[in-house]
C-alpha cells in the first residue's frame, strides 16, 4: 500500500519542545537559515555590507536629517554619521546609546543619552548637551531670565551651567522626555516639563510648590527592594513602562499631579534591556527562561518551541542580547554556548507563531532604515534583507513511521515544486541507511519527480541547498510503499 510523507507547508518552523514523535510535518526538529513565511521553504541572503567604519560599533541609531533617512553609530567616545565623521565637539564617556528623533520648536532633532553623560542633542538646534533650567517670566508674561537647577537666576540662557540628567534609556511621552538608568540613582526616572507654555526638553527642574507640579519636570523613584535597578524604559499602550531586573512598573496618568506607579509583573530572571521591543500591541523581552510577551494585562512565555536553543544561552553574556520588531517579526540575537558575542539570530513570526534560527553572528544593534533592517556587526553596518549570495539552508523533519512502527517501508519517488539557480539536496534517512539526491532547479517553478529509494521502518527527510544556491521548495512528497505483512 502506498503512502506519502507529505509536507504541505513549512510554516510551523522549528519545534524543540514537542516530543519528536508528535511533531507535525510542517515543523522541523532542526533548521537554519530558512524563510518559511509563505509556506514554502526558501533560502535567505547573506547580509550585505553597507559600510566598514574601521572600529567596533557599539550602537546603531536612526537619524532623520531633514527629509533624508540616515543612521548614526556610536564608536568609542564619539557619535559618527554614515560618512564616519564625528558630530560632537566633546567626548562621551561611552558609546552604548539610546536615542529618539522628533520635531521640537519646528526643527528636527536627535536626542540621545549614554549612561554617564548628560542627555544631548544633534540637529538644527545645535549639537550639544541639553541644559536644565526653567524660564522666568515677568508680570507681563515676558521672559526676564533663566533659573538654573540650583535656583540661581541668570540673565541669559548662555550663562546656565546646569544640565539635563544622565541615563541609559530615553523615551518621549505627552511632550515630555523621560530618562532612566542613571548610575548614581539607579531607581530613578526623570522627566522634563510639558507645562502651560508647551514642551521644554531643557526644563527638568522640580516644582517649588505643589501647585506648580504641571509647570516643571521632576523625577520618580521606583523602589522594588529586590536589589534590582532600572534596565529599560518603553512607551507601551500610551503609558511609560519601567523595566527593572526582575519587575516592571507602569506610570499611570498624563501629568505629574496625577502620576501613579503600579507594578505590572515580576520575572524569574534578569531581563536583557536591549531585548525589549514594542510591537503588536505589547512588548517582547528576554529573560533567563526565554522570550516573554506582555499584552497589557498578562505576561506569557512564548519561546517554548526553541527551548533547547534558549537553554544553550550563555547567561554570563545574555545582557549583550539585542532585538528589533520589524514586519511583524521579533528578531533577537543572543550568545549561545561559549560565545561572548551574539552568534544566533532568532526570528519569531508573530503572525504564524513560528520560529526560525539563522547563523548570523556578532550582531550588536539593529535599526530599520529605508524599508530595510540594518544591523551592526564588529566594525561594520550590514543589511539583513539585501544581498547577492545565500546562506546554507538546512531543514530536518522528525522521524516518521506513517502510523505503523513495525511495518517495513520502501521509498520510491520524491515529488515537489521548486525553482532556483542551483541544486537542492534531499536526504532520506532510515534506521538502516541514508540516501540522497541532488536535483538541479530551473529559474521558473517546475514540478519535479525523481527516484529516491530507501528502506526502513522510520523515515526522516533533510533538505539543503547545494553550494549555498538560491532555492525555493514547495510541498515535497516522498512516496513510500508500506509492507503490511
Enumerate the predicted regions with their spans.
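Beta-sheet repeat architectures centered on beta-propellers
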Residues: 1-81, 91-109, 228, 267-282, ...
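Sequence-pattern detector for short linear motifs
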Residues: 131-132, 136-137, 179, 422, ...
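Beta-propeller and closely related beta-pinwheel folds
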Residues: 46-56, 89-97, 138-320, 354-356
Amino acid at each position: 500500500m502506498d503512502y506519502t510523507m507529505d509536507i504541505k507547508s513549512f510554516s510551523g518552523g522549528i519545534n524543540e519542545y514537542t516530543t519528536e514523535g508528535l511533531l507535525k510535518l510542517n515543523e522541523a526538529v532542526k533548521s537554519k537559515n530558512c524563510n518559511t513565511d509563505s509556506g514554502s521553504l526558501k533560502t535567505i541572503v547573506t547580509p550585505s555590507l553597507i559600510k566598514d567604519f574601521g572600529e567596533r560599533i557599539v550602537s546603531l541609531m536612526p537619524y532623520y536629517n531633514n527629509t533624508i533617512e540616515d543612521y548614526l553609530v556610536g564608536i568609542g567616545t564619539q557619535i559618527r554619521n554614515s560618512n564616519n565623521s564625528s558630530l560632537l565637539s566633546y567626548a562621551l564617556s561611552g558609546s552604548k546609546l539610546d536615542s529618539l528623533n522628533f520635531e521640537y520648536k519646528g526643527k528636527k532633532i536627535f536626542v540621545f543619552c549614554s549612561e554617564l553623560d548628560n542627555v544631548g542633542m544633534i540637529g538644527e538646534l545645535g549639537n550639544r548637551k541639553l541644559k536644565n533650567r526653567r524660564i522666568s517670566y515677568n508680570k507681563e508674561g515676558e521672559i526676564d531670565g533663566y533659573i538654573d537647577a540650583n535656583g540661581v537666576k541668570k540673565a541669559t540662557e548662555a550663562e546656565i551651567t546646569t544640565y539635563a540628567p544622565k541615563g541609559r534609556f530615553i523615551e518621549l511621552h505627552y511632550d515630555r522626555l523621560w530618562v532612566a538608568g542613571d548610575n548614581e540613582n539607579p531607581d530613578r526616572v526623570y522627566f522634563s516639563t510639558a507645562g502651560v507654555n508647551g514642551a521644554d526638553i531643557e526644563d527638568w527642574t522640580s516644582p517649588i510648590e505643589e501647585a506648580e507640579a504641571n509647570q516643571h519636570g521632576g523625577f520618580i523613584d521606583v523602589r522594588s527592594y529586590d536589589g534590582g535597578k532600572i534596565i529599560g524604559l518603553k512607551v507601551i499602550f500610551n503609558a511609560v513602562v519601567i523595566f527593572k531586573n526582575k519587575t516592571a512598573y507602569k506610570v499611570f496618568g498624563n501629568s505629574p499631579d496625577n502620576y501613579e506607579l503600579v507594578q505590572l509583573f515580576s520575572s524569574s530572571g534578569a531581563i536583557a534591556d536591549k531585548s525589549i521591543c514594542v510591537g503588536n500591541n505589547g512588548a517582547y523581552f528576554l529573560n533567563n527562561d526565554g522570550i516573554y510577551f506582555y499584552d497589557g494585562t498578562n505576561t506569557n512565555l512564548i519561546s517554548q518551541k526553541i527551548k533547547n536553543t534558549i537553554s544553550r544561552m550563555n547567561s554570563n553574556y545574555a545582557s549583550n542580547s539585542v532585538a528589533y520588531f520589524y514586519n511583524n517579526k521579533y528578531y533577537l540575537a543572543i550568545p549561545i554556548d561559549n560565545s561572548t558575542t551574539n552568534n544566533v539570530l532568532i526570528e519569531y513570526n508573530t503572525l504564524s507563531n513560528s520560529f526560525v534560527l539563522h547563523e548570523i553572528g556578532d550582531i550588536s544593534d539593529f535599526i530599520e532604515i529605508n524599508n530595510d533592517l540594518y544591523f551592526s556587526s564588529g566594525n561594520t553596518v550590514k543589511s539583513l534583507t539585501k544581498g547577492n549570495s545565500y546562506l546554507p539552508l538546512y531543514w530536518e523533519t522528525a522521524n516518521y513511521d506513517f502510523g505503523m512502527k513495525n511495518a517495513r517501508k520502501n521509498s520510491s519517488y520524491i515529488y515537489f515544486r521548486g525553482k532556483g539557480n542551483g541544486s537542492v539536496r534531499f536526504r532520506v534517512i532510515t534506521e538502516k541507511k541514508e540516501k540522497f539526491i541532488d536535483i538541479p532547479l530551473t529559474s521558473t517553478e517546475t514540478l519535479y519527480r525523481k527516484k529516491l529509494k530507501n528502506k526502513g521502518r522510520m523515515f526522516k527527510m533533510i533538505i539543503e541547498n547545494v553550494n549555498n544556491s538560491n532555492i525555493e521548495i514547495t510541498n515535497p512528497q516522498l512516496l513510500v510503499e508500506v509492507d503490511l505483512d
